[in-house]
Amino acid sequence: MTDVESTYADFIASGRTGRRNALHDILVSSPGGNSSELALKLSELDINKAEGEGDAQRNPSEQTGEAQGEAAKQES
């Protein structure tokens, strides 16, 4: 049996009949909550950085790129 045949057999055995049921499964399995709760949780986030935190949260590639740029300036 090929991969396609086994996938087809799995699909048939699942009892799903297509996209219509797939969408229903997604909606049923989503966690409870609504948009007003999401807005409340987002408003509680603290996005202000304390002084000095900005450098620690950058990507390592960004930090190394800046360090290489500074090294090139010093060599000039």
Swiss-Prot record:
Q: List keywords of the entry alphabetically.
A: Protein kinase inhibitor
Which Pfam family is one of those matched by this entry? PKI
Classify the source by domain of life: Eukaryota
Q: Which residues carry this modification: Blocked amino end (Thr)?
A: T2
Q: Which GO terms describe its cellular component?
A: cytoplasm; nucleus
Disulfide-bonded cysteine pairs: these are none
Q: Where is this region: Disordered?
A: 49-76
Site (Important for inhibition): give the residues.
R16, R19, R20
Q: Which GO terms describe its molecular function?
A: cAMP-dependent protein kinase inhibitor activity
Q: Does the keyword Endoplasmic reticulum apply?
A: no
Q: What does this protein do?
A: Extremely potent competitive inhibitor of cAMP-dependent protein kinase activity, this protein interacts with the catalytic subunit of the enzyme after the cAMP-induced dissociation of its regulatory chains.
Q: Which family does it belong to?
A: Belongs to the PKI family.
Q: Under which name does UniProt file this protein?
A: cAMP-dependent protein kinase inhibitor alpha
The source organism is: Gallus gallus
The uppermost taxa in this organism's lineage are:
Eukaryota, Metazoa, Chordata, Craniata, Vertebrata
